Design a protein with these regions (language model features):
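Catalytic-site neighborhood detector that most strongly recognizes the C-terminal catalytic loop/helix
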Residues: 43, 182, 190, 246-248, ...
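Active-site/catalytic core of tyrosine-dependent DNA strand-transfer enzymes
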Residues: 98, 190-194, 237, 245-248, ...
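Short basic/aromatic active-site micro-motif
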Residues: 116, 148, 152, 299, ...
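Basic, Lys/Arg- and aromatic-enriched nucleic-acid-binding interface segment
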Residues: 134-147, 151-155, 166-230, 235-236, ...
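C-terminal catalytic core of tyrosine-transesterase DNA break-rejoin enzymes
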Residues: 166, 209, 213, 217-224, ...
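Short, polar N-cap/turn motifs at the start of nucleic acid-interacting alpha helices
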Residues: 232-239, 321, 340-362, 370
Length: 384
């Protein structure tokens, strides 16, 4: 029986048209066992030799038969169902699905996976930035997608193509060659200390003081805040247990879910004033398990409803616009400025590590360093 030529055993010859050709074995047909021969062409023997070496290396690292089965669109669908969807929360999974079905597949989904280039992806990003909106642009709005949305699509593509490399469908990830848009940092704003009293007075007038007081002294995420139940409060130890958040289940229905990370599951110490407010709030609806039930339904507040109440409080108090999430920044900033150490603030916020907290609140920690330097300078001046 004749010996099969191994992948990469190529040969070079000069053709009648004057060009040089290198042939190599790209693999074997699974059904017939016959070799699959491919070639490279060049003007010189040296050029073909270089091309052949590269092609041979690629042939050894790619499952050619399987690679031919996929376009970008069919691979993304396979990756989504097998690797992404089972491990993602519903909002993220839905974001990926929409990105694939509405933005990527209609534009470049027919490109064979093995022929996809970084330039194809870069062109996609350009098109999405200029014409990405599915509905006609509203007055005053651009017709393209935002840089943050395009960056998210790039991240998804990069993950999907990394998996394709691992499964030997492509040699390397073409997304590595792209320059995705940079996301401009959102300007961090906080509620100035001198405005906190006005804010809380307006909250009290709307009957939601306990909820927003707790937010300002804990920095809870809105999904964590509305998911709190009376059983999460330990009156004796003056702590709040954070172990769940408002979210959506795999069917897309509102539901209670676990926080995103293990670090988000935590106990937060609160002052006695907060405990007293929460106890008084519970006495208004002693049989209701929710700490802050909706007055309309008696059920858990929808996170968006809390955001709307926050906007009304700002308006009532005559204060400038501030995102609800900025109340979390307000807590962290004021805690750091008042001497609470970074590690403690980080654990209260449910951050992955204190380093992330340091990077997020650099402006505050820089002020703390300057204050520490001044104190040390004063101390050294006294001892010298």
């Amino acid at each position: 029986m004749a010996k099969k030529r191994a992948n990469g055993e190529g040969n070079i010859r000069k053709r009648k048209d004057g060009r040089w050709e290198g042939r190599y074995t790209a693999g074997y047909d699974e059904k017939t066992g016959k070799r699959m021969i491919k070639n490279v062409l060049g003007k010189t023997q040296a050029e073909v030799k270089e091309k052949l070496a590269k092609a041979v290396a690629e042939a050894g690292s790619v499952d050619v038969r399987r690679a031919d089965e996929y376009t970008l669109g069919t691979w993304l669908q396979t990756w989504y169902e097998l690797y992404a969807k089972p491990h993602l929360r519903f909002p993220t999974a839905e974001y990926y699905r929409r990105g694939i079905e509405l933005h990527i597949t209609p534009r470049i989904g027919d490109i064979p996976l093995k022929k996809l280039t970084g330039r194809d992806l870069q062109g996609l990003y350009k098109d999405l930035r200029e014409h990405g909106r599915l509905r006609e642009a509203q007055k005053g709005k651009q017709p393209g997608l935002s840089d943050s949305t395009i960056r998210g699509i790039h991240t998804m593509l990069h993950n999907a193509l990394d998996r394709a490399v691992k499964e030997r469908l492509i040699v390397r990830n073409p997304a590595d060659d792209c320059v995705p848009p940079k996301i401009p940092k959102h300007e961090m704003k906080i509620l100035p200390p001198e405005q906190i009293k006005s804010y809380l007075t307006a909250a009290d007038q709307r009957g939601v003081l306990p909820m927003f007081y707790l937010e300002l002294i804990s920095g809870l995420r809105k999904g964590e805040l509305v998911a709190l139940q009376w059983s999460d409060l330990n009156i004796e130890n003056k702590t709040i247990s954070v172990s769940k958040q408002a979210g959506r289940n795999n069917a897309g229905e509102p539901d209670i879910t676990r926080p995103k990370t293990e670090n988000s599951i935590r106990k937060i110490s609160i002052p006695q004033d907060a405990v007293d407010l929460l106890v008084a709030e519970h006495q208004k609806h002693p049989s209701n398990p929710w700490m802050f039930p909706s007055p309309k339904t008696g059920e858990m507040y929808h996170p968006d409803s809390v955001v709307n109440i926050h906007k009304k409080i700002l308006k009532d108090a005559g204060l400038e616009h501030l995102r609800f999430h900025d109340l979390r920044h307000t807590f962290a900033t004021l805690a750091l400025q008042n001497g609470v150490d970074v590690k403690t603030v980080s654990s209260m916020l449910g951050h992955f590590d204190a380093g992330f907290t340091l990077r997020t609140y650099t402006h505050v920690t820089r002020q703390m360093q300057e204050s520490a330097a001044e104190k040390m300078g004063n101390f050294m001046a006294q001892v010298m």
